[in-house]
Amino acid sequence: MAKVPDLFEDLKNCYSENEDYSSEIDHLSLNQKSFYDASYEPLREDHMNKFMSLDTSETSKTSRLSFKENVVMVTANGKILKKRRLSLNQFITDDDLEAIANDTEEEIIKPRSAHYSFQSNVKYNFMRVIHQECILNDALNQSIIRDMSGPYMTAATLNNLEEAVKFDMVAYVSEEDSQLPVTLRISKTQLFVSAQNEDEPVLHKEMPETPKIIKDETNLLFFWEKHGSMDYFKSVAHPKLFIATKQEKLVHMASGPPSITDFLILEK
């Protein structure tokens, strides 16, 4: 996701190596000064720690946010934490979930000084099942099937799709991500797809029940992305890796070619 460049910070860094920074900055034109003053005006206290619409007039008391409007989350000291699209007044539909997975314009903006433990201390809350007993076919039209050698999966061309693994896709939500995290549970079981390191086979992890909250077990979570007709599953625990297939190889985690990372979801 693209980050919004901090133009004022870049300007300061550029001048920081010059002893004449203080005097030079005073010679900026009034137009330049007014630009920065307008762009970095202090945030009013009544806007701290609140969602604010970028498109709705702040003086309107009757305006309401729709699903497609942009909102921003800011901290008490005015730092922008996140820009995302969401609804504050309607139930999220399947079309909305598809829009989140397919939206390449949304951005996450986090403070540069945010500590790692702060960014990783995220809770993912169960939302609902969005696909039941679906099949995953890769770009070569191979279906994912169970591998009898262990808790693994592989891809094969099937004449009978009843032999393919059926998955239930469960959606989760958190306050820290604008993408759509999901789990892939083998239908009619409590076995969940679990991401491993690069080039290592994904595993089945048995859970006593479908987790209502996921905090430490992020290997079970994948950001579902949709580009055109193809679907991608990016690991939350390993954000550069995707579920992938490859000829004569178990289903594994990979960053891209020569492994195949694009899939087509086939409904029951």
Curated annotation (Swiss-Prot):
List of residues that carry Phosphoserine: S87
Entry keyword annotation includes Nucleotide-binding: no
Residues excised as propeptide: 1-112
Molecular function GO labels: copper ion binding; cytokine activity; interleukin-1 receptor binding
SMART domains: IL1
Subcellular location: Nucleus; Cytoplasm; Secreted
Subunit structure: Monomer. Interacts with TMED10; the interaction mediates the translocation from the cytoplasm into the ERGIC (endoplasmic reticulum-Golgi intermediate compartment) and thereby secretion. Interacts with IL1R1. Interacts with S100A13; this interaction is the first step in the export of IL1A, followed by direct translocation of this complex across the plasma membrane.
Name this protein carries in UniProt: Interleukin-1 alpha
Native source organism of the sequence: Ovis aries
Gene from which this protein is expressed: IL1A
